[in-house]
Amino acid sequence: MPRKQRVVTTPSPPTSDEDEDMDFGSTSQQQQQQPTRNNDGLSGFKSITEIIAEADNNIPSEQIDKDIDSFSSYSDISDWRGIPKFFPSLSSLSRRASTYENWENRFKVVDYLVSCSGALKDSVSDYVADYFEKNESGEDHSVDVELVHAVSMFVILTQRLTVQLQLYVSKSIASANQQAKRGTGRGGRQVDLDDDIVKWKDIQRHRMINCLLELLELRVDTVAGTKKKAIQYVFAPDVMEKDFLLRFLDTVVQLLEDPENMARSSQQWISHYFRILKVLSADYGMTKDVANCLFTALSHSYLEAANTFPFIEPLVTLMKENGEGSGRIYQPLRNVLQLVICRVGNLYAGERAEKPPPKAFCMMVQSLAINVHDLMLQDITHVYRLLQNQHVNVRMSTLHALADMFSSSYLSQSLCDTFASRRLKREGIFKRLLAHTNDEATNVRSKAVSLLRNIMENRRIPEEFESCGLLSIVGSRLNDKSVQVRKSAIQFLTTFLDNNRHGHDFNREMHQLKLNAKCSELRNAEEPQSKAIQGAENAFRQNLFTLTAGVRVEVYDIFRRRYRVEPERSITDILTGLFSPGSGNRLVRYYVAQENFPFRDRIPSLRERRSDDMEDDDDDTVSLEDDDMTSLVSEVVKWVVAQAEEDYVTFKVQLTQMDDDQLLENEQEARDRNNQIMQLRAQVQQLINKMSIEQELSRCVTIALRCVLNGETAEIKEGIRFLTRCKLFEITGADDAIRSMCSLVWRPSADILNELIEAAEDMFISRLDGNEKASERDSSTVENLMKAMNGVTEKDRPSVEEVIYLLAATELVHVDSDKNKVPRKRRPIEANVINKLWMIALDMSHGINSRKIDALRILYPISRSERGIAEARSRLRVVQKKLMDPELAVDALRIISILGTPTKLENEQDAYSRPLFKIHQDDSLWKSIEKLFFYEIMKADDNPDRDWFGVIRLTITTILSLSMDVNVMLPKLASHFVYRTKRISDFFLFYCDQVDDATDDTRKKMAQRRREYWALTYCRVMEKLMAFIGEVAVQLNAYIQVTIPKLHTRYVSKMVDAEKNDANIREEPVRFLSDLEKSVAQRKTIFTVPQDTTPGATSNDLHHLVSVMCDKRLFVPNKLMGRLLPIVVYGMRCKIMPTRIRHAATVAYGKMMPLSAEISAFAAPSFFSAMTKSSSILLRCNLVAACCDFAFAQPTLFELFAQSLFRMSQDESPLARESTILVLSHLMSNDMIQTRGVLSEAARCICDPTRAVRDVAQSFFKELNSRTDTIIQLLPEFLYHLSNGNERMSFKSYKTVFEFLIQLLKDKPKASADSMIDRVCIKFSNTDMNDSETPKYLLVALAKFVQNDGGLHRLQDNWRHWSKFMCHPSVAKEYRMMVEHMHSTSKNDEFKSQCVELIDNINKIESEGLRKEDVAIGSSITKNKGRAKKNPTTMSGSSRTTSRAANSRRRAPPPAQSDEDDSDSDDAPAAPRSAARRKAKKSAVADDDSDSDEFMLDD
C-alpha cells in the first residue's frame, strides 16, 4: 500500500458486542475530531495544555475498567487510534494515584501503550514524509489532527504512568523490605502484583523511556533528505510548542523524586532515563532547562539519608559515551555541567547567603569534583567562592571537593611540570586547604587537616610542598582548643611519617655530616682544575728541589764573574728539557736577559761597588757573608722559580690543546662534571629538605607530648602512635618525649595502658625479620632498652621502669575495654635479653660505669616480675659485690631490696611448706649494706649527685623484706647510727673546750678549724639521722598497715586450729619464718581470732587492731620508736639547733604522727601551722605530702584541719601548689576527705601562671568530674568565692576558670544546668548591695545558663535576689546587654516579649530606684502573664510534691559548705562530721528560709 494511503487507513470496527461499551469512547473521539483553530488560524489541533485541561475529569472507576478492556482490542492490532478514543479514561487513570487502586490495570495500560508505540511511530514517519512530498510538489498539506492529538496524548500518558508506576514500585519494595526486617511477610494474593513489579523493573520501565526517546530521536527519510528531530514536523506548519518538550523533561524531573535513586544499584536506571536529558540538550537546545532540572532534586528529602549525590555520575557517563554522534552530544552535556558548576558557586550568594543549604547541595559539590574535576578546575573561581560561605557544611564539602581535585590525574606531577596553569591551580588549591586549617569553625579545621592526611596517605603531596612549612602549619593545630582538631593534626603527622619520601632515617647529626661532605664535594666540583695543569704542577713540584739548587748556583755565578750574560734564544727548548741537568743555568741566563727582569739595576751597582777589590783578586769572588747580597740572591731565585713554574704550566697546556683526542676527553669530562654537579645539588637540596622536615617535626614533638599528657583519651592514643613513630624515625627530642610519655602508665585507663604497652613493644623489643638471627634481635632489644634508660631524668625514671616491668611481667592479665578489638599477641622480653643485661651489669672490667648503671636500672623492674626475680635471687652474691663501687651501689641495693617480693607460688594459700627467701642476720650481705650505709651517711660533703637518702630508704626496705629478724636488725642499725652521731657531737664539744682552753694562737686556730669541721659534720649527719627516723616511721606505717593484715588473713585458719587443739603452731622445718610470723604463730599476743570472718567485718577488726597495736606497742619507751621519738622532739624544740636540722626534724615528726593517735592529737596544730607558715618551700612541700598518710591513719582528726590543706593550693610557691593539688587528688580519689566549698581555692590553679600547676589542676578537676557530681554541687560556691571579697580574681582569669568548669558539665543532665540558675541567683543574697563588681562576675554564669525559654523563666523567678543590684548603672548596663542579646538571637515571639518586659523592669529600677515589691519574698515579674509563681519545692522545673521534696531533704547529704563556714578563720579547725550533719539536718527541717530549702533540694 502506498505511504500516503496509510495515513488515512482506519482499523476494522469492533464487534457488535462491544458497541455499547465504546459509546463513551466514540463520543470522545467525535469531539476530538472537531477541528479547532488557534489565534493565528494555521492549524486545527489543540495544544497539549488544552488536551490536559479537557481530560481532567473524574471518570468512575467502572467506566475506566471498561474502557481499558476496550483499549486492549486496539493494542492487540497495534492500532494507535485507541489512544485518542479512550484518552479521557486513560488520563483519569494516570491522574488518580490514590483514588484508583487497581494497579494491575495500570500495568496493563503500559503494555498496551508499548504495543501501540511502534504503529504510532510509523504513522508519524509517513506523515512527515508526506508533508515534505507535498511541500516539494507545491500541493496543500492537510493537518492530521487525530495523529497530532494522538502523539500529544501518548506523550502525556507515557510520562504520567512511568512516574506513577515507578514511585509505586519503589514504595512497595521499600515496604516489603521493612516487613522482612520485622519478620512479617506478604500474603499470597499479591503474587501477581509482585510479578508485575518485577516485570516493570526489568523490562517495562525501560520500554516506556525508549518510547519517549524514539519520538525525540525520530529520523525520517524524505525527498528533502534525512530529517532529524522529525517529531517537530508533526505540528507543521505550526512550530512545535515548548510545553510538548517540557513533558519529556517533566518525566525526568518527576523520576528524580524516586527514593530508589539513592541506591547504588539504580545508577544504570538513572543513566537510562537521563538519555532524555541528553537528547533535549543536544538536539533541542534545552541546556539551561536540563541544568535547572538537576537543582530541583536538591529539595528531595530522601537525599538527606544518602551518602552521595546520585545524578552527576550518570550524566558524566552519558557525556563520555563513545558511539555514533558522540561528538555532537558530548559538547552540549559538557555545557550542562559547566552551567551546573557556575550556578553551584552562585546559588547561595547574595540574598540567599544566610539560607542554610541542604545536604544534597554539599553532596553535589563533592560529586562534581569527583566526576568532572577538569570542568571544575576550569571554573575554579566559582568553587573558591564557596569557601567564603558562612555555613560550615558548605565550606567542608568545598574543601572535600578541592582535595579530590588536588588528587586527580588532571593535576598529576607530570602534567603540572608541563603546563604552568595547572601548576598554579594546584598551588592555589593547596594554599586554601592549608588556610582553612585555621578556620573559625571547629569542624572545618578538622576537615581540612583530615583531607591533608588523606592526600598524604595517597602520596599526592608534591615534594616542594612538604618542606615549605606544611608540618609547622598543621603542627600548630596541636594547640587548638578542640580535641577533634588536635586528634586530626596528630593523625596527619603520623601519616606523614609513615608515607614520607625520605625514608626512616631522620638522624640530625648524621645528616649534618652528610650535608657538609656533599657541600665540600660540590664546591670542588664547581671549581674544576684541568688534568694538564694539575699534571704540570705536580711534575714541577716533584723536581722543585733539584731545579732550585741549580738556579741558586747559577745566580751566585752571575754575582761572582765579570762576563756579560748571554741570553738563551728560545725558552721552548729549555722547558722541553727543564728537569735535565744544567737546565737551571739556562733558566737563569734566559730570565736575567729579559727586559722585565726586576733586579737588572741592582746587580751592576753591586759589581761596581766591589770592582776595585776584584782587580787583583785571582779568585774573582765576591764575599757572600754580606746580608744584603744574601737576601738579594734569595729574591732572585724565588722570582726565577715562580716564572719557570708559570711558563712550564702554560707550555704543557698548549701541548695538550694541540691534541684532538685530549680535547674530546676534556669535553666529556666537562659534561660528566656538570652532571655530577646537578646530582650533588639535588642531593644537597634533598638533605636540606629532610633536615627542615626533621626540625619541624622536632618542634611538633613537644606540643604532641603536652597533648598526650593533658588531653582526652582519643588524642592520647593518637599521640602515643605519633611519638612512637618519631622514636623509630630518630626525630630529635623523641627520646625525651618517650620517657615523659611513659608517665601514662599510671593512668587508670585500660585503653591508654594497652596502647602504651603496644607502643613500647614496637619501640623496645625488636622483631625477628627476614634472615635475622635471634641473637641479633636480642642484642638490638638490649640496645633499645639501654638507649631508653640512658639520660633519663629522676622524674621520668619510675615511669620508664614501670613500662619495662609491664613488658617483662607476662603474668599480668590483659585488660581491654574495647571488646570488639582483637587482642594483640604480646611480645615479652626474652630470657636471652635478661641474661645479656646481667652480663653488662655485672661486668667486672674497669671502665665507664654508665652502661652498667643503665643495665642495673633496667634489671630492677625486670627483677620485680615473676620471670626476673628468680634470676635476680640467683645472682645475689655478684650483685653484693657491686655494693663496693660507690657509683653502682645504689642501683645494686635497689635490686637487693626487692628480692623478698613473694612470687606467685609463695602467695598461694597452701604455700606453708615452701621456703621464703629470707637472709640471716649474720650474713655478709648485712655487713656490706651497713658499710655502704655509713660510707654515704658520714660523708661531710653536700654533693647533689650522691643519693644518700636513697641509701637510707633502700636499706630500711631491705631489712624489712629480707631480714629473718627485723626486731634485731633495724634497732641495731639505728643504735649504730645514733652512736656515731653522738661521737660526732662529742668531738665537736671536745674541740669547743680546746678553743676555750688554748693559750697558744696556733693551737687555738687549729682547734677552731677542727671545731668548725665537726660542727658542719654534725649538722649534716644529724639531718640525715632525722631523715632516717622519718623513713623508718613511713615504712613501718606501710609495713604495719599492709603486711600485718595480709599475714593475719593468711594465718587465720591455722590460728583457729591451734586454739581448738590448745597447741602452738608447729614451725615447718623447710621454711624460714620471719620474726613477725613467729609472733603470730607462737605467742598469739598480737592478734585475736575475729568473731565475724566476713570480709567487711574482718577488715574493720584488723584496722582497729592495727591502730591499737600502734598506740600501745609501737611507742613503748624502751623500744625502737620510743627511743627515736625524743631525738626528733629535741631536734624540733632546741632553739640553738640549726634551721636545717629543725626543718628535717619537723618533717620526720610529721611522718611519725600517723603511727599514733595520741601523738597526732597533740601535734596536729603545730604540724598544720608549720605547713602553712613555714618560710622553707621544701618543708611546706614535705608536710603537704605527709598529709596523705595522716588522712589515712587519722581521718577524724584530719578533717578538723583540712581547711589548712585546701589553703595551701594558693601558696606562693608553685611547687607547694602543685604538691597540694596532687595530694587533694589522691585523697579525694580514695574518699579520704570531704569536698568543701573551699575547693574553690584549688580552682584558682586552673589559670595558674605556672604550666605544671595549671596542668595538674585541670587534670584534677577532670578526674573529679568523671567520678562524682561534686563540681555541679559546688559550682555556685566556686563562682561566689572567686568573685567576692578581697581575694577576687581578675575578670579574665575568672572567665577562664568558669569556661573550663562549664566545659566539664556539657555531658551532665540538662536539669542540673537548669537548677544552676536558681543556685547562682541565691548567691546574690549573700552579696553586699553596695558591691557592684560581684554581680558582673556572676553574670558570666547566668549568661551561659540562660540560653532557652526555661532559663529565662528561672531568671525571672529569682528577680528578688538580683534586682537590688540594678541600682548600679554599670551593673544594669551589663544585664540589659545580656537580655538584649537573648532578644536578638531568639525567633520565639513570646520569648522576645518576656525579654522586653525584663528590660523594662531593669530600666525602671535604674531610673526610679528599688521598690519594695522587687525584693519581697515570692516576687516575680511574670505574675500578670498567666505563669504561676513557683514555690521552693518546684523551683527546678520538677513535678515533685512537697512531701517528696521533704523526703529528699531528709535523705540529702550534708551541704558542701555554706558561705559563712568558708569565711571562718583558716587556723580554726572545721566542725566534726557529726556536727555538720546535725547542722544540715536542722537547716533541712526548718523551712522559714527558702534559700536553704532550695539549696538542699538541688543537692
Curated annotation (Swiss-Prot):
Inactivation phenotype: Results in high larval lethality in hermaphrodites, and survivors exhibit a XX-specific shorter and stouter body morphology. Higher percentage of spontaneous males through X chromosome non-disjunction. Increased number of crossovers, redistribution of crossovers and a reduction in crossover interference in meiosis. Increased number of rad-51 foci in early to mid-pachytene indicating double strand break formation. Increase in X chromosome axis length indicating aberrant chromosome structure. RNAi-mediated knockdown results in chromosome segregation defects in mitosis.
Gene behind the chain: dpy-28
Post-translational changes noted in the entry: Sumoylated. Sumoylated in the context of the dosage compensation complex but not in the condensin I complex. Sumoylation is important for assembly of the dosage compensation complex and its robust binding to the X chromosome.
Organism: Caenorhabditis elegans
A single GO molecular function term of this UniProt record: histone binding
Chain intervals with Low complexity compositional bias: 1432-1446
Residue ranges, annotated region (Disordered): 1-43, 1421-1499
Gene3D superfamilies recorded: Leucine-rich Repeat Variant
Compositional bias segments (type: Acidic residues): 1458-1467, 1486-1499
Any one cellular-component term (Gene Ontology): dosage compensation complex
Signal peptide, first to last residue: none
Family named by the database record: Belongs to the CND1 (condensin subunit 1) family.
Protein name (database record): Condensin complex subunit 1
Subcellular compartments: Nucleus; Chromosome
Keyword Ubl conjugation annotated: yes
Tissue-by-tissue expression: Expressed in somatic and germline tissues (at protein level).
